């Protein structure tokens, strides 16, 4: 099992433990010293690094994305629903770019010149991964923000293992575009699931585990192939 697989596995376990402690004892991440998600995830990553430099990079990336994702979540939560609708208009092109190896022709849907140019580009696997993550997270955020807009201003301290997964992935890429997609993905997932947590705790816990596992498996499969 590679370092990425081990780190993703321990990160999911740590996040589930954090969620259990919060639900069992009624604590929040900001008030429980043992429930600081960014710190625990960073420490967990250290045990699965082969060198001191990898451990340092894991800590820096985890904490950086923890704070960046939390800050951007506040911004996304305050955006009007009209903006989320405009984001949904870019979903088809994101889907085609991320799922296509070349130009894709969909029956009954003509592709414009700009879209053809984008689809004809040979994208690295890491870029395709981030586009998929971005597309999925935008979908979640649009859904929950439209259903429960009044619950968006909630505790934004819960950041999921997608932060660490993304931070480890970004170490293999120097693209600024990839970095921006990581931050947006983390913020969207955080905003969506945190909003849901104040509505239904058990459903939030289930989605947290499902989304974490899904994104982690997708990341590991792409990085190891």
UniProtKB/Swiss-Prot annotation:
Which keywords does this Swiss-Prot/TrEMBL entry list? Answer: Membrane, Transmembrane, Transmembrane helix
Its localization reads: Membrane
| Gene Ontology annotations for the cellular component aspect, listed alphabetically | membrane
- Originating organism: Saccharomyces cerevisiae (strain ATCC 204508 / S288c)
Q: Where are the transmembrane segments?
A: 40-60, 63-83, 151-171, 176-196
Domain of life of the organism encoding this protein: Eukaryota
Q: What else is known?
A: Partially overlaps PEX14.
Q: What membrane topology is given? A: Multi-pass membrane protein
Please report the name of this protein according to its UniProt entry.
Putative uncharacterized protein YGL152C
